[in-house]
Amino acid sequence: MRRFFENVPENLWRSYEWQIQNRIKTLKEIKKYLKLLPEEEEGIKRTQGLYPFAITPYYLSLINPEDPKDPIRLQAIPRVVEVDEKVQSAGEPDALKEEGDIPGLTHRYPDRVLLNVTTFCAVYCRHCMRKRIFSQGERARTKEEIDTMIDYIKRHEEIRDVLISGGEPLSLSLEKLEYLLSRLREIKHVEIIRFGTRLPVLAPQRFFNDKLLDILEKYSPIWINTHFNHPNEITEYAEEAVDRLLRRGIPVNNQTVLLKGVNDDPEVMLKLFRKLLRIKVKPQYLFHCDPIKGAVHFRTTIDKGLEIMRYLRGRLSGFGIPTYAVDLPGGKGKVPLLPNYVKKRKGNKFWFESFTGEVVEYEVTEVWEP
């Protein structure tokens, strides 16, 4: 289904370039498609200088115009709460302290580094952890800036894993993308290259380009971390994009963010993860929403996340259950969270809660040692 765009020829609809060139970016444009709520209209007006708005025709087509609480709509259309100081005072622009001495480079964990290579996004998601960069304009890192990042990685031989993010890293020109990957592959201690991309969700047409896939395959091993938040985002186009990546030997993992009003429902999450497994995408993380200024209204309680994790157990295969994690403030790293299944302990005896809620006694006898 191509809601709103039924008259667009299929060859154009399948064009990534057409999707980007025809993004809806103004109040006047979006009102052609949606009857905006007062808080949305005011939100678009008041966020433009701070948190700009843009949405691809493809992602817009997934919105049910009759539902003001549509989960795609909530992720893509600004609301005035984003600039409500009373609400957003609990957040920080850079709560995870990503900014360092080298622009765009974050070296938090000893063996891996994050490269933010562009501020451009196909869609400016309203819950984005990097909303602070929205107002910087749409620009990619220059080759000189990339070279500075590469030199840093060369000097730090403990780095074996490079995560390329943004903005949207796979929006880079093919020429610049190949330059970046070729420079990284010159470094012998770099073993893994990952992309954090939401294009399979927002503009899956990007992966209908064989030249892009040729480049990614050429510099294998490449891993894709994508970001489906709701089952409505898994369409035939998204499935085709994932399939094209997998056929090139590029694994695809998913990192979902727990968002109030979007997916803070156990049944919604179960449906999402089941659909991801069906298209061969592994649910890797369920992230608790970060305290980012401009996105605080999307946060739920930790108890809600634990409730969802408890619900998934017994209803979903183990490899389909993501790790629920909190990103600690100040760049202190991720902490995994699990419901407490140990209800009681006495010496070597434990009482565990099963997935059905039954409490079962379990005794650990002496461990034999040779």
From Swiss-Prot:
Its EC number is 5.4.3.-. [4Fe-4S] cluster binds at residues 121, 125, 128. Residues 107-322 form the Radical SAM core domain. GO terms for molecular function: 4 iron, 4 sulfur cluster binding; intramolecular aminotransferase activity; metal ion binding. The keyword Coiled coil does not apply. Keywords: 4Fe-4S, Iron, Iron-sulfur, Isomerase, Metal-binding, Pyridoxal phosphate, S-adenosyl-L-methionine. InterPro entries: Aldolase_TIM (IPR013785), LAM_C_dom (IPR025895), Lys_aminomutase/Glu_NH3_mut (IPR003739), rSAM (IPR007197). The keyword S-adenosyl-L-methionine applies. Its cofactor is [4Fe-4S] cluster; pyridoxal 5'-phosphate. It is an enzyme of class 5 (isomerase). PANTHER family: L-LYSINE 2,3-AMINOMUTASE, LYSINE 2,3-AMINOMUTASE-RELATED. This is Putative L-lysine 2,3-aminomutase aq_454. It comes from Aquifex aeolicus (strain VF5).
